[in-house]
Amino acid sequence: MKFRVVVMMEVLAGIAFFGFNSASVAAEWESTLAAAKKEGKVAVLTDVTATLRDALTLEFQKNYGITVELFGSSGREVAPRVAAERKAGQFLWDIYIHGSTTALEAMIPMGAFDPLEPALILADVKDPKTWRGGAIEFLDPSKMVLVMTPFHRGTIFYNTKLVDAKEFKSHKDLLNPKWKGKMVVDDPRRAGPGVATFTFFYLHPELGADFIRALGKQQLTILRDYAQEVDAVGQGRYPVLIGTADFVAITRARQGVPIAIVDARQLKEGTDLSPTNGNLALFNRAPNPNAAKVYINWLLSKDGQTIFARANGYVSARLDVPTDHTEPWRVPLPGAIKTYTKAAMQVKDNLQPLLQEVFGSQ
C-alpha cells in the first residue's frame, strides 16, 4: 500500500512539475513575443535567392507582424563586412544563416556570436527527440552555431542537353580526357562549396591528393560566383561543373534551365554531408534581441524548417519535416564524410598548400 502511495505521489509530482514547466515556457514565450513586437523587426544576414528570401520573410511576418530585414551576401563577403561594421561601432545584425567555414574560421574567432541554446524556448524545438541523431547538432563546443540542414550535397553538376548522367559512376570519371578544358569549378581556395567538395575529395580514401592533382590537369575553369558558375553550364558554355552551391542550381532548374545534379547513389564514393548555408547563429549585441529569439524559434519549428528546406531543396535536421520535396539521395546516411566540422576543416593545413600547388595562388 505504501508503495502505491509513493508511486502515486511521484506521478502527481511529475504532472505538477511538467504543468508548471509548460506554464513557465508559455509565459516566457508570450513575454518574449510582446517585447519582440515592440522592437518591430529582425535583421537577418544570409545567402539569398528570390525563393529563399520569400521563405525567410513572408510566413514569419504574416504570423508575428514583425518585419524581417534580409540582406544577402556570399560567405566570402560576410566576415569582412561584419568586422568593418563592428570596428566602426555598428552592430546591425540579429541572425546569421550561412555557411560553416565562415562561421568556424571567421565569425566565432571574431567573437560575433552568443551561445544559441539559451535562445531556444519552444518545447518541441528543445526536445532532443525532434532531431536526427537524438540531439541538436552544433558546430562548436560553445553551441553558438546550430546545424539546421545536414544533407548530401551535389558534387557534379551537368547540362542535361549535353551530358548523360550515366557517364558518371565515380568521381574518377571526371578524369576522362573528353572533359579536358570543358569543366567549371567553384574556386576551392576560398570559403564555399568548392573547398567543401575538395575537402571531400581529400578525405575520401579512394580519392585523396593524387585524384586532386590529376583533376587539376583537366584544365578547369575556376570561377568565384555561384550564379556565373551555374549559368555557364545552364547556357551550354561548359557541360560540367564541380562543387557549386546546390541551392543556386536547384533554383535555376526550377526555372527551366537545363542543369541537374548527379545522383550521389550512382557515384562509387557517394558525396559529403554538409548543411551548406543552413547554419543558424545569434549575433551578440543584437539590436533586436527579442525579435531574434522569436525568429530563431519559428525557424527551428516544424513549419519554419519545412518552409526553409523546401525553398532550398535541403533536408532538415528535424525528423518530422518531410523530405518529399527533394531527391532521396539527399537524406543523411550513417558514416558519411562530414566536410563542415572543425575536424574536417583542420585538414586545410594540408589541403590548401595542395590546392595552391594544383591551381596556383589566388
Where are these regions (language model features)?
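Periplasmic-binding protein-like
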Residues: 212-216, 221-223, 256-284
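Bacterial N-terminal signal peptides
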Residues: 8-20
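Extracellular/periplasmic bilobal clamshell ligand-binding domains
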Residues: 322-362
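Immediate post-signal peptide segment of exported/extracytoplasmic ligand-binding proteins
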Residues: 25-43, 61-62, 175-181
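Mature extracytoplasmic/periplasmic domains
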Residues: 278-339
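Extracytoplasmic ligand-binding site segments that recognize negatively charged/polar headgroups
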Residues: 43-57, 69-83, 91-230, 234-237, ...
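A ligand-binding cleft/hinge motif common to bilobed small-molecule-binding domains
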Residues: 103-106, 239-260
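A bilobed periplasmic-binding-protein/Venus flytrap-type ligand-binding module shared by bacterial periplasmic
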Residues: 155-162, 199-203, 275-288, 307-308
